[in-house]
């Protein structure tokens, strides 16, 4: 058999496809990250070893702020290239919608790295607006106000505008115009009004229904005309400065984007012909991330276009429409939060143990005294070959079903059942291996890989750290971060440590396609085996829930300084005490209750005084400990 190489691992896990030049495999067989343009490589295994020395254990979220900087710069440079190519005379504004990841350390890094590109922020709720107004220090950066709004929301936005913030209030529903007029009159402010338009065009992929006629937000063309009449009646003609549209997140097909842009451009042209000097067009989100690295529109986890192609289409469409109608080019806004933030975070989890289906030892031979079903199944196993494979598969299934029925009726004993089950799974393994060499695998054999896969139990909560994997079957690239110079000999699915059968992952990127199993290595004694889950920087942290009371994981910010990595900040994961407090348990009261119970048990002679002290000490220490296994 050919010796396994690093190149084989690169191909198997398709790291060159989804890694987007940020991730690779070094000569040691470890995954590295290259956050900066100077190509400094940071070994993820080295980071985990250093964190372990600091008593920071997996699961841990590794954030690389330099990647945020690179993603912002890449988007801005794509606009600059498009500007030069198409003669675009407007300004472009990169906006980060904080709903993508509202964690203060992440937003702080984005603002810091985005200053040189005048990056703005978007708020979609009242709490988000409170955060955005306070952290966005640059007065010339845009703040876009989306989502449902009440009077206090609009008052906060207009007061901030009055004090110098560059704020646009985007009307999602007609009644919001009345609130804006009321508050603006009270504050004596001339509001910057935007209108979200409900396009007929829709996106593609998991969020296609975010656009089109079924979309939740936006005004139809008829409602837009009603809104324009209201604007005239209110004396806000000059206040309408922006139109906004959004056809969905993670748009997989560039053609859908092109269609939406052409439709939106006509709204821009028509509004100008009606006398409205709209000077901003907010193209919303939708710029996708290639999670599986296939660059295919047929996959909901991929996209068939680049950032440059997306930007080119945005710029060209509005330049072309404006030029043909002798209208000024609009200032273009993009809200591409997923594209900006997905790559910068890697979740590292450790494998606790594995479980596999029982198999019969190769040296086993059926004896005359064995049950007839054992002898029949042994004969099938002993004579398996490609010609009779499917017939043998059917016979083996029938024997197993019969054995289970006989066991339920007390006719077959436990030893016989165990032998038949182990031999059945051995037959399945051999049939699966034979099927891999067939040009056309029978339909009923195609699911054997998944059925026969080992279970790798990992120290994390799917619901806390990868909620989209559970909720919408979002695919994330997953692979070992070490031993990649070794052949992975086990096929596995991943199980989390929650008490929920949904807490598993059984869809993976392998060999450039989506598979039901992940090739992994056997565990080694006293050696941690780490898996990296990549591209998790968008939505996952903020959408995570506390199923089984597993809290936020440890997190670390790692940057490059003078050609070496530096762990800038460490954020401890939530403790048992903190998560109990979320669900309204008072930890101090819990301790007092335990003290009373232990005192009573000591007095009754059930435990000794020392045992009582040890129990209370263990309990108190546990309250301040990590919610995950240590």
Pin down the residues of each PLM region.
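Charged, compositionally biased N-terminal leader segments and the immediate start
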Residues: 1-31
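Low-complexity, highly charged intrinsically disordered N-terminal segments
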Residues: 20, 25-102
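Short, glycine-/Ser/Thr-/acidic-enriched flexible segments
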Residues: 30, 38, 67, 101-103, ...
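A non-catalytic, amphipathic alpha-helix used as a structural packing/dimerization or gating element
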Residues: 66-74, 226, 263, 313
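Active-site-proximal beta-alpha core segment in soluble small-molecule metabolic enzymes
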Residues: 87-282, 289, 293, 304-309, ...
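Helical (often loop-to-helix) elements that flank the catalytic cores of nucleotide-handling enzymes
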Residues: 299-314, 363
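Charged (often Lys/Glu-rich) extended helix/loop segments that serve as interaction or gating elements
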Residues: 313, 319-630
């Amino acid at each position: 058999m050919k010796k396994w190489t690093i190149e084989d691992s690169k191909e198997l896990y398709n790291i060159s496809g989804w890694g987007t030049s940020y991730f690779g495999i070094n000569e040691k067989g470890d995954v590295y990250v290259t956050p900066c343009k100077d190509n400094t490589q940071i070994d993820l295994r080295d980071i985990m070893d250093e964190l372990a020395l600091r008593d920071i254990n997996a699961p841990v979220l590794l954030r690389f702020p330099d990647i945020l900087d690179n993603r912002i710069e890449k988007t801005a440079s794509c606009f600059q290239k498009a500007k030069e190519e198409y003669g675009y005379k407007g300004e472009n504004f990169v906006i980060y919608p904080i709903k993508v990841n509202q964690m203060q350390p992440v937003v702080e890094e984005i603002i810091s790295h985005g200053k040189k590109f005048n990056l703005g922020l978007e708020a979609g709720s009242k709490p988000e607006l409170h955060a955005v107004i306070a952290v966005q220090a640059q007065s010339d950066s845009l703040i876009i106000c989306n989502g449902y709004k009440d009077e206090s929301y609009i008052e906060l936005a207009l007061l901030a505008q009055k004090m110098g913030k560059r704020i646009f209030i985007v009307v999602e529903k007609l009644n919001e115009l009345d609130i804006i007029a009321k508050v603006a009159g009270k504050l004596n402010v001339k509001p910057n009004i935007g209108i979200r338009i409900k396009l007929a065009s829709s996106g593609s992929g998991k969020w296609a229904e975010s656009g089109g006629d079924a979309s939740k937000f936006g005004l139809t063309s008829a409602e837009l005309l009603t809104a324009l009449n209201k604007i005239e009646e209110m004396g806000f003609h000059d206040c309408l400065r922006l139109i906004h549209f959004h056809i969905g997140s993670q748009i997989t097909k560039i053609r859908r984007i092109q269609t939406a842009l052409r439709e939106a451009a006509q709204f821009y042209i028509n509004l100008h012909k009606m006398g409205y000097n709209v000077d901003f067009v907010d193209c919303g989100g939708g710029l996708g991330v290639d999670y599986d690295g296939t660059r295919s529109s047929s996959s909901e986890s991929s996209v068939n276009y680049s950032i440059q192609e997306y930007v080119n289409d945005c710029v060209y469409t509005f330049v072309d429409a404006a030029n043909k109608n002798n209208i000024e080019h609009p200032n273009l806004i993009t809200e591409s939060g997923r594209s900006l933030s997905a790559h910068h975070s890697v979740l590292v989890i450790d494998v606790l143990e594995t479980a596999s289906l029982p198999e019969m030892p190769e040296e086993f031979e059926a004896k005359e005294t064995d049950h007839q079903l054992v002898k029949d199944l042994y004969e099938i196993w002993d004579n398996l070959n490609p010609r009779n494979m499917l017939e043998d598969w059917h016979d083996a299934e029938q024997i197993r079903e019969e054995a289970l029925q006989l066991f339920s009726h007390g006719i077959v004993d436990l030893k016989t059942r165990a032998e038949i089950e182990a031999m059945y799974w051995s037959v399945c393994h051999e049939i699966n291996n034979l099927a891999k060499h067939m040009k056309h695998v029978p339909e009923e054999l195609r699911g054997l890989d998944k059925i026969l896969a080992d279970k790798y139990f990992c120290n994390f909560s799917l619901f806390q750290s990868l909620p989209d994997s559970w909720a919408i079957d979002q695919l994330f690239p997953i692979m070992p971060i070490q031993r990649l110079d070794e052949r992975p000999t086990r096929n596995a699915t991943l199980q989390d440590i929650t008490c929920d059968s949904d807490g598993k992952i059984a869809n993976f990127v392998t060999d450039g396609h989506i598979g039901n199993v992940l090739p992994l290595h056997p565990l080694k004694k006293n050696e941690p085996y780490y898996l990296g889950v990549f591209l998790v920087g968008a939505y996952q942290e903020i959408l995570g829930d506390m199923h089984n009371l597993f809290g936020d994981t440890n997190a670390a910010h790692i940057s490059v300084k003078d050609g070496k990595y530096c762990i800038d900040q460490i954020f401890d994961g939530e403790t048992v005490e903190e998560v109990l407090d979320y669900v309204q348990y008072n930890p101090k009261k819990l301790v007092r209750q335990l003290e009373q119970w232990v005192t009573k048990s000591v007095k009754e002679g059930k435990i000794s005084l020392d045992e009582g002290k040890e129990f209370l000490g263990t309990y108190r220490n546990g309250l301040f400990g990590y919610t995950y296994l240590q």
